């Protein structure tokens, strides 16, 4: 007995192991079968809920059957097959389709009333072959127009759209027949023109779209010469969608004119202008900075009577004013007093109004010269902390130094140059000439301990006196830098002058006028290296010497 029991136990254990070894193979087969079924029928998956609707494709049996019925009805009414789906879908919906849809809606409402209000409509839709009312209309058009726009269907993916346009298996669906690209092109046509076209041919109301009208419509862009084709065909979408009309003709109906009117707010219009349109902006010049620069080159006149002294500090800190009579800039009374233009000098105790501007351009001319191209004597010297600044890392101390420590700013702040506080000797930068200031003779005195810049010059005083004559003699483009005041042109020019005067003394009274003219032409330029007192003394001594030489020669 014990042997039999042990034998049975061993048999059952071996059988269990055999079944356990066979079990994974059955599970794998089930998984592969399920995956195969899901991969094959993933596009034909039927939901158990009857309320879910499946949007048809051009290859579905419902859509194909409906199109076959539609073609059968149209062929029965029109034996000559003069109706075109292109004109039907793009311009006017057919009247018979609207009537058929209304009849179908009435029949379905009667069926729902006959079934009773207790039964929900979801239970009644057990047949999946039944089609919806809006099965051929896109959802956006359903929300806007209801069921008034037939013959529209939904394509689920771009691959289906490509196959639908090119590789359609059915004979009735191809690129030239009911493409979804042509169905949204619906335009409201002239109802009066449509009525005229129908009343002219009362016997052919069903044959509204004939072959002649269709050919004229497609060939002449809706502009038919014959009077019988006028009416609904005179207003076609082809003349409005033409790309040549859209891009090449600046008509008032072009989309570029209406692009700015899409947004009613100024902020929206600014955004639209910043984004830009695909159309050319011919009237807008992209180089407005050069235009402003050319306008700023005009001469400056003094018109101190028209401006009060109260507004003198606030004028020309914005855009310079212009007079009505002459298109010239107006100078303030402060300019006449200080003999310095406010275009080249900022007001004291004023915030930095400069900064990066989108219209700033780089002018590679003789006006703006970089600091590396100047002479060694005109390069600004650093302050007492120059050794510490140069030795240490610039990136570590850049933000601690302040704005006055930046040596090469594109728009330097002039407040530091005009500041009266002499407690801290800051780095002085030569003031760059602004737009229109072509005669700024600014320089740096390297000998003076205060390391300041002298702004008064001979040309600046001449500019403040009145308007410069355009036809006059142009000033010299070079400047004499004087190293010693007492020996101004003594070795070369004075000796040549005395020799010329001695040679011309025997000529008589006729040559005396020439020497006077020559002596009057020898005008010394104002020295930037001396103070005002030394300048006046040097001028007096120079005049006395020249007068003495002239007196001796005479």
Curated annotation (Swiss-Prot):
Keyword Repeat: no
GO molecular function: transcription coactivator activity
Region Disordered, residue ranges: 1-31, 98-117, 410-475, 493-554
Gene designation per UniProt: NDD1
Low complexity composition bias: residue spans: 98-113, 448-465, 493-513, 525-536
Positions with biased composition (Basic residues): 466-475, 515-524
Modification after translation, per record: Phosphorylation of Thr-319 by CDC28 is required for the interaction with FKH2 and recruitment to promoters.
Any GO CC annotation of this UniProt entry: cytoplasm
Extra remark: Present with 779 molecules/cell in log phase SD medium.
Subcellular location: Cytoplasm; Nucleus
Protein name listed in UniProt: Nuclear division defective protein 1
Composition bias type Polar residues, residue spans: 411-427, 539-554
Function according to Swiss-Prot or TrEMBL: Transcription activator involved in G2/M transcription through its association with FKH2.
Residues found modified as Phosphothreonine: 319
Top-level taxon in the UniProt lineage: Eukaryota
Keywords, sorted A to Z: Activator, Cytoplasm, Nucleus, Phosphoprotein, Transcription, Transcription regulation
Induction remark: During S phase of the cell cycle. Expression is cell cycle regulated by HCM1.
Subunit: Forms an activator complex with FKH2.
Single GO biological process annotation from the record: positive regulation of transcription by RNA polymerase II
Ranges in a coiled coil: none
